[in-house]
């Protein structure tokens, strides 16, 4: 979810937005340096589950587990924000952390009842525990009886192998095909060659039926448990929705902080008079070990800057760096430059890069650029 938010990141020309976004990134960077990065692992989109639960739908075991994992992430992130001392103040981020609603009761109940994406715990309810105990005892009785059949001299020659197997959810033994009429039992399956029949002895049919009945009861009891947990999710839907939004925003903010930390970025100063003063700026997409830092000053002593020099001398990179810094800063990102660098605030950023010569209009490379520049000049506000 934070990934989608990052993909939709756009710069703002409103100073109020820029200040808030930059402060959020700065506070997150400070927290990462002091506490490490908070873990958002297990944080997944669960709105479809919430919607279905609110419509009296029953969530699956896997879906409930994902809700439980989300509640766990909420607790971890909330704990991450605990202050080690009273001097720690993160005005912007504390607003998000403080609004996270604890979901401990929901987390604990799901954790108690759900073992994995496919398994409900025996202790999820007293009824389920008793039913499974009966199933286990019935299985043992059937196996004991079938072991008696396998070891009986009366049936020894009729058996293809001395093992107990399951076919169609019924305990069976492998019987030689030629003894199908002699062995007292029901056929449930046969081998590919047809030489072996998997038969359920008549003496265990009632026991197998008992197991089937218990399994049906187990399924009903599990459904009751899932309904109760789904109702609990519905009861907490408002808090979960709010936490989803808060964690998405926090995940996004800390991603910006990690990005700033990776390229050793700094918070730029924004000047409403449009003055740019970049100190040792480094193009964010170039190898930090190879990139040549630049200093750019514009709008104070002079309002126009012409860059000249030989090919591959860094002219285009310098221009792109200024443009990217402007967009990054106004989107709330720190810039890879020394502390104290300043940027202006612009409603639009225009660029004419490369050879966009139009063959249809029969324009030269130079005139093609001039056409672009004239178009840009007609759109800018001075």
Indicate residue ranges for each PLM-predicted region:
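Conserved RecA-like P-loop NTPase ATPase core
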Residues: 250, 278, 311, 327, ...
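Flexible beta-alpha connector loops of hexameric P-loop NTPases
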Residues: 285, 308, 350-367
């Amino acid at each position: 979810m934070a990934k989608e938010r990052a993909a939709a990141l756009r710069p703002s020309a409103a100073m109020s937005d820029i200040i808030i976004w930059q402060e959020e990134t700065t506070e997150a960077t400070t927290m990462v340096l002091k506490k490490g990065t908070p873990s958002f692992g297990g944080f997944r989109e669960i709105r479809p589950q919430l919607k279905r639960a609110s419509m009296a739908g029953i969530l699956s075991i896997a879906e409930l587990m994902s809700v439980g994992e989300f509640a766990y992430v909420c607790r971890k992130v909330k704990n991450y924000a605990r202050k080690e001392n009273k001097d720690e103040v993160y005005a912007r981020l504390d607003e998000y952390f403080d609004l996270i609603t604890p979901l401990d009761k929901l987390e604990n109940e799901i954790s108690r009842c759900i073992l994995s994406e496919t398994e409900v715990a025996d202790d999820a309810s007293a009824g389920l525990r008793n039913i499974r105990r009966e199933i286990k005892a019935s299985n043992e009785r059937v196996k004991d009886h079938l072991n008696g059949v396998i070891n009986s001299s009366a049936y020894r020659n009729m058996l293809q192998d001395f093992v107990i197997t399951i076919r169609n959810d019924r305990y069976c033994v492998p019987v030689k095909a030629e003894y199908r009429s002699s062995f007292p039992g029901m056929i449930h399956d046969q081998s590919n060659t047809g030489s072996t029949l998997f038969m359920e002895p008549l003496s265990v049919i009632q026991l197998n039926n008992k197991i089937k009945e218990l399994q049906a009861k187990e399924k009903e009891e599990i459904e009751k448990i899932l309904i109760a947990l789904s109702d609990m999710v519905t009861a907490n839907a408002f808090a979960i929705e709010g936490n989803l939004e808060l964690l998405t925003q926090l995940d996004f903010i800390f991603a910006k902080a990690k990005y700033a930390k990776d390229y050793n970025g700094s918070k730029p100063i924004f000047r409403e008079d449009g003055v740019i003063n970049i100190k040792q700026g480094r193009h964010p997409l170039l190898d930090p070990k190879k990139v040549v830092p630049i200093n750019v000053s514009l709008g104070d002593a002079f309002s126009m800057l012409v860059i000249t020099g030989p090919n591959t001398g860094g002219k285009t990179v310098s221009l792109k760096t200024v443009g990217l810094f402007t967009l990054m800063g106004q989107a709330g990102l720190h810039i890879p430059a020394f502390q104290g660098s300043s940027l202006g605030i612009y409603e639009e950023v225009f660029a004419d890069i490369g050879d966009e010569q139009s063959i249809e209009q029969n324009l030269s490379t130079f005139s093609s650029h001039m056409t672009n520049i004239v178009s840009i000049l007609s759109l800018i506000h001075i």
